[in-house]
From Swiss-Prot:
The gene is panC. PANTHER family: CYTIDYLATE KINASE/PANTOATE-BETA-ALANINE LIGASE, PANTOATE--BETA-ALANINE LIGASE. Homodimer. The lineage of its organism: Bacteria, Pseudomonadati, Pseudomonadota, Gammaproteobacteria, Pseudomonadales. The reaction proceeds by a bi uni uni bi ping pong mechanism. InterPro entries: Pantoate_ligase, Pantoate_ligase_C, Rossmann-like_a/b/a_fold. GO terms for cellular component: cytosol. This is Pantothenate synthetase. GO terms for biological process: pantothenate biosynthetic process. Catalyzes the condensation of pantoate with beta-alanine in an ATP-dependent reaction via a pantoyl-adenylate intermediate. Gene3D superfamilies: HUPs, Pantoate-beta-alanine ligase, C-terminal domain. It is an enzyme of class 6 (ligase).
Amino acid sequence: MNTVKTVRELRAAVARARGEGKRIGFVPTMGNLHSGHAALVTKAAQRADFVVASVFVNPLQFGANEDLDKYPRTLAADQERLVQAGCNLLFAPTVEEMYPDGMSVQTRVSVPQLSEGLCGASRPGHFEGVATVVNKLFNMVQPDLAVFGEKDYQQLAVIRAMVRDLNMPIQIIGEPTVRAEDGLALSSRNGYLTPEQRTAAPALYRTLQHIAAGIGRGQRDFAALVAEGLAQLSAAGFRPDYLEVRHAVSLRPAMIDDRDLVVIAAAYLGNTRLIDNLYLHVEEKTA
């Protein structure tokens, strides 16, 4: 695996691979990679002949009081993990390489509606930062396909909409969330948790499972199920940011006759914000 740090080197390496008739797969990351990221790269390697990954902690998607400065940067370990997962090329640019004129004058990409609410409500500007950097990376790499984790469910929906609305010839593949044995979704931010918080953390996914089970049994009072879930989270030591049942594609609030739903949540354990979601398909009842 080669590592490049400039757009020029990146484009030259991708052009060589494309010249050999190779299909290009792409996995954008912020580094501090874990098994969940490795699964994304493995999926890309299954679907493409040449896999590009990027490691870039994107300042544009962090709010003023968020964890940009303390977000872990572990490039050497990331390189090892990428090699093992089947990556061919790593793009690890500086902020100056990505935003040469500074971020204040950077053209922005905004995906309306899907970016609002849920994480967008408590992290204003976050999805604009995500859409902008992913758009730039797509233009730099020009992949045939890109793989994203379903753990960041709203982000995946935003990127799918951007690709569709801007007519990008890129196949977007969602990869199921990778979990620890106790159910906690793998996340770079799990490293912030104290041992006690780590023990409590799986309650987030259990709460989603509880709500999904209720819906599966035919309950349609989503507000009552969510109220139960919020009580469960608070009892486990969480400060919930949001917990909602949404339509799985449009992310609008769920309606009684919706078949494809997602139970989606963000909650704080101490200062660490964890997110998770659970998709479910509701079978139509036959008389």
